[in-house]
């Protein structure tokens, strides 16, 4: 830590650590992210999220009922001014196994992306390909990324608004070739908790704008929208995330997710609705279309006393 914390800050940090540890443990359990004997490759960017992820996983490793390895990996993409000494120095203090990789993806990105355009998408794809390959090389069974709950929700809205897809970041993902399993242990954790925890812990943060790329304006707009919602309607973000875990394909419009074409009614089904009328009190209403008086009675269910049939 860069400076001495007050007793109140120490207490707050312990509370945040417990919360994050609980959330990460629950996410790991819910999605079976880490199993006995796993070698987990924690990808570090030098940002608050990946630092917090490594910190919490190391903490859980000491408490978990199963045994698993943790290997920290950072990819130096040769961005101008990247401080090469910060991560090794920090990781040395932890005593965790680590690898620092070097690959000049920066030059590739600058060559392919016009000046002034955001480079984040291509940069991340090149980084992912390098990390996937290295994970296989060292025998890593899981690749842990530092995306949190807010990232997942933002991605869903980005895809809805700009790509016409209901798609987010899954907490657990098998790569297209089936060779790598990606996990996101912070899937249940809020960004503001992670940011506060990182500040109290004094992680040596490396800025992500060394490449000079403009911020992804679409993601920034979605993030601001969610921040405003959280401010104006407390609990809305939690409700959105809960909704993402409770989808009902049969109640949607995606024909790939539900077979609407094969739906058929059962002509032998009993004459009843979703609610058993026998459990409802008798009541009357007027059939506006036919001007007929319909009485719903517990004994006879439906008694039509007047019906009009056109010639």
UniProtKB/Swiss-Prot annotation:
UniProt EC number: 2.8.1.-
GO CC annotations on file: cytoplasm
InterPro entries: Rossmann-like_a/b/a_fold (IPR014729), TilS/TtcA_N (IPR011063), tRNA_Cyd_32_2_STrfase (IPR012089), tRNA_thiolation_TtcA_Ctu1 (IPR035107)
Cofactor: Mg(2+); [4Fe-4S] cluster
Amino-acid positions noted as binding [4Fe-4S] cluster in the UniProt annotation, renumbered to this chain: 120, 123, 211
Pathway the protein acts in: tRNA modification
Name of the top EC class for this enzyme: transferase
Cofactor note: Binds 1 [4Fe-4S] cluster per subunit. The cluster is chelated by three Cys residues, the fourth Fe has a free coordination site that may bind a sulfur atom transferred from the persulfide of IscS.
Subcellular location as annotated: Cytoplasm
Major place of residence: cytoplasm
Gene3D superfamilies attached to this UniProt entry: HUPs
UniProt keyword annotations, A-Z: 4Fe-4S, ATP-binding, Cytoplasm, Iron, Iron-sulfur, Magnesium, Metal-binding, Nucleotide-binding, RNA-binding, Transferase, tRNA processing, tRNA-binding
BP GO annotations: tRNA thio-modification
Catalytic reaction annotation: cytidine(32) in tRNA + S-sulfanyl-L-cysteinyl-[cysteine desulfurase] + AH2 + ATP = 2-thiocytidine(32) in tRNA + L-cysteinyl-[cysteine desulfurase] + A + AMP + diphosphate + H(+)
Motif (PP-loop motif): 45-50
Family named by the database record: Belongs to the TtcA family.
Alphabetical list of HAMAP family matching this protein: TtcA (MF_01850)
Further comment found in the protein's record: The thiolation reaction likely consists of two steps: a first activation step by ATP to form an adenylated intermediate of the target base of tRNA, and a second nucleophilic substitution step of the sulfur (S) atom supplied by the hydrosulfide attached to the Fe-S cluster.
UniProt function note: Catalyzes the ATP-dependent 2-thiolation of cytidine in position 32 of tRNA, to form 2-thiocytidine (s(2)C32). The sulfur atoms are provided by the cysteine/cysteine desulfurase (IscS) system.
UniProt protein name: tRNA-cytidine(32) 2-sulfurtransferase
């Amino acid at each position: 830590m860069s400076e001495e914390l007050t007793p109140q800050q120490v207490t707050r940090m312990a509370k945040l650590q417990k919360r994050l540890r609980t959330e990460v443990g629950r996410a790991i359990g819910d999605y079976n992210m880490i199993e006995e004997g796993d070698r987990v490759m924690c990808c570090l960017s030098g940002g608050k999220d990946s630092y917090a992820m490594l910190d919490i996983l190391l903490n859980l490793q000491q408490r978990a009922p199963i045994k698993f390895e943790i290997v920290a990996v950072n990819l130096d993409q040769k961005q101008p001014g990247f401080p090469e000494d910060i991560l090794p120095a920090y990781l040395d203090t932890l005593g965790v196994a680590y690898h620092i990789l070097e690959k000049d993806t920066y030059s590739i990105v600058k060559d392919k992306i016009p000046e002034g355009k955001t480079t984040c998408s291509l940069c991340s794809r090149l980084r992912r390909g390098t990390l996937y390959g290295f994970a296989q090389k060292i025998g890593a069974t899981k690749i842990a990324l530092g995306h949190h709950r807010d990232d997942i929700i933002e991605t869903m809205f980005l895809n809805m608004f700009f790509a016409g897809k209901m798609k987010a970041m899954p907490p657990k993902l098998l790569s297209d070739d089936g060779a790598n399993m990606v996990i996101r242990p912070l899937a249940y954790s809020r960004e503001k908790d992670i940011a506060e925890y990182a500040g109290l812990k004094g992680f040596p943060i490396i800025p992500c704008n060394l490449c000079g790329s403009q911020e992804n304006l679409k993601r920034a707009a979605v993030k601001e929208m969610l921040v405003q919602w959280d401010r104006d309607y407390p609990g809305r973000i939690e409700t959105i995330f809960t909704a993402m875990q409770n989808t009902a394909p049969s109640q949607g419009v995606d024909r790939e997710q539900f077979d609407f074409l094969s739906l058929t009614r059962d002509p032998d089904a009993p004459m009843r609705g979703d609610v058993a009328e026998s459990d409802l009190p008798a009541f009357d209403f007027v059939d506006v279309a036919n001007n007929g008086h319909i009485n719903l009675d517990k004994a006879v269910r439906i008694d039509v006393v007047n019906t009009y049939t056109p010639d």
